[in-house]
Amino acid sequence: WDIGYVSTPIKEYIDQVDNKELRILIPGAGNSYEAEYFHNQGFNNVTVVDISEQPLKNIKIRIPSFPSLNLLYQDFFDLKGEFDIIIEQTFFCALDPTLRQDYVNKIHDLLSEQGKLVGLMFDAPLNTEHPPFGGKKKDYKTLFEPKFNLKTIELAYNSIKSRAGKEVFVNFMKK
């Protein structure tokens, strides 16, 4: 799961974003190399939430200038706030599939008007008893379409080698 750096699809997406003041959330982020990359690119409003405290401590060690107030040790489903972009990078697949509708609802609640869920989801069966749980593109469409305009849900052309052909890049805008 932890590849040790920001994944290419996420990096290439954020490199196209000019507004450094956007409020960005990375849920279930683990060591969040995405947050480190965004911070180093000048994004000022990046928030990381994780149910495990150690990865948040690791982020602060790696990036001493990262605002401590934006490293939230709590359950994603209890989070309050409003964000312009929520980054999906191996959080959805870590959740028990019975929580997927709750995830969609919570993402929708946390996004601002015109807010976006952007990131990667596995388009492969993977595991059924433990994370990472896989999924199918068609199921994601069914799950997200009631609350989101599905701008992009395509096989990621720039996945890392070990995930090539197994993940879709998504860009869903809040309805």
Regions found by a protein language model. Name each.
Residues 1-81, 95-175:
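Class I (Rossmann-like) S-adenosyl-L-methionine-dependent methyltransferase catalytic domain
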Residues 90-94:
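Short catalytic micro-motifs in class I SAM-dependent methyltransferases
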Residues 87:
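A conserved beta-strand element that flanks and buttresses the S-adenosyl-L-methionine
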Residues 84:
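Conserved acidic residues
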